[in-house]
Amino acid sequence: MAATGGAKTIITAFIANFCIAIAKLFGFFITSSSAMLAESIHSFADTSNQALLLLGRKRSKKLPSSERPFGFGRERFFWAFVVSLVLFSLGSMYALYEGVHKVRHPHDIDSLWWALGILLFAMILEAYAFKTAVGESRYYKGKHSWGSFIKRSRIPELPVVLLEDFGALMGLVFAFVCVLLAKITGNAVWDGVGTLSIGVLLGVIAIVLAIETKSLLIGEGALPEQSAAITDAITGSPEVLHLIDLRSEYLGPETLLVAAKIEFR
């Protein structure tokens, strides 16, 4: 699986999330909606996360040294794991805290049309970023399901941005529906419910990302089809009598370490 993808997706998401974060923050000051504030914090967290992913890509390109003879490819795994922690702590935990506060102390939403207009604007930008992530990921996904792609991918940035953008889009839908319900019913508790929903959604996504990126950080081997191709290449040599053992581990998205115990003729 090639590992050069992801840069376009990250940059697109970074620009979109930064613009969305500013728009949502402006919307919060106008409407006093806690769901809008939670979404603003969410978008600022996503923006910082894309910056961390770009940092990881840059640091991974450092040349090997005597202390790091296999290079710095794992930097991309590490920073992807940090992203999951930021999403959980800054995004999910804050949204849950703000949601509980809003449910206990509801506050009417001001300027409904401003709130809905800003959320629709954010949905358009986020949908474009998500479409870009899906388009680039589809190339690497192949015939596998999206769930399988997230588990199999050795390129950490694509699943991270894909799930972040999906979470952001769904969070906007939650915020839009709950802000509308709060105004229709006259019950501002719905605004808090929307904020809590966003917090739960971000928490689930952060946990999934943490599990997958932790697995890459600890070390994952070649995919089954890659192991089969390596085995065929070794056993196809006339000098090889028997392949006793084969082990592999990704040292970075672009570096696969292979160790083989071979009996020669």
Where in the sequence are the language-model features?
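Aspartate-rich (DDxxD/NDxxD/DxxxD) Mg2+/diphosphate-binding motifs
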Residues: L53-E75, H105
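Acidic (Asp/Glu-rich) catalytic motifs at the cytosolic membrane interface
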Residues: A16, F29-K58, L96, V100, ...
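Flexible interhelical turns and helix-capping residues at alpha-helix boundaries
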Residues: C19, G27-I30, H107
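Short, charged cytosolic
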Residues: D46-K61, E136-W146
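Residue-level hotspots within pore-lining transmembrane alpha-helices
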Residues: I15, A38, F121-L125
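Alpha-helical transmembrane segments and adjacent TM-loop junctions that form the membrane-embedded core
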Residues: G6, G73-R265
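Topogenic membrane-insertion module of multi-pass membrane proteins
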Residues: M1-A23
